[in-house]
């Protein structure tokens, strides 16, 4: 979680880029990086396609369905390997999602996001998901250790101070109304 412009999306992109660089044996943008082998799936910048009749929300649903198929392939398909003992071992999926279901109303977004995260938690995945929806942070208490909350906090005074540092917990401060009020004060 975190306020607008606090660094959530930039962190997700940095994580994805560094993961790909590391898996390719290239230098990464970090002092140190320790990773495991995953199949990577990201959804960062969903766009509509009006020429094909696909609204923004529909594009989001299509992408989430692609993620579910991707996870199933990792668990059951060609990416599922046989171990020395003869057991099937799934190659886990690393998911990076930025603000899912933002193309719908607040209540549907919350309920749909919760339902999707409950479904994805049953898959062999690890992931990082950015959200403004603080209600979703309650899933940390409900999902037997499957979810953990981290945030990018800001300090609100006469202005906004961005720390750009990730920390354990849920963001306490939000800045959208604060920033809008700054604009409205000018007029």
Where are these regions (language model features)?
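ATPase nucleotide-binding head domains, primarily ABC-like/P-loop NTPase cores
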Residues: 1-187
């Amino acid at each position: 979680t975190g306020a607008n412009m606090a660094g959530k999306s930039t962190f997700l992109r940095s994580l994805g880029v560094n993961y790909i660089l590391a898996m390719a044996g290239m230098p990464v943008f970090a002092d140190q990086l320790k990773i495991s082998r995953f199949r990577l799936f990201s959804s960062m910048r969903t766009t509509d396609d009006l020429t094909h009749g696909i609204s923004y929300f529909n594009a989001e649903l299509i992408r989430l369905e692609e993620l579910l198929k991707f996870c199933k392939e990792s668990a059951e398909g060609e990416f599922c390997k046989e171990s020395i003992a003869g057991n099937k071992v799934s190659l886990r999926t690393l998911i990076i999602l930025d603000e899912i279901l933002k193309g719908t109303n607040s209540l549907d977004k919350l309920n749909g996001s919760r339902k999707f995260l409950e479904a994805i938690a049953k898959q062999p995945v690890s992931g990082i998901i950015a959200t403004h929806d603080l209600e979703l942070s309650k899933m940390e208490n409900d999902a037997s250790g499957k979810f953990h909350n981290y945030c990018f906090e800001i300090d609100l005074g006469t202005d906004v101070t961005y720390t750009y540092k990730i920390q354990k917990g849920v963001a306490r401060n939000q800045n959208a109304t604060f920033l809008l009020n700054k604009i409205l004060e000018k007029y």
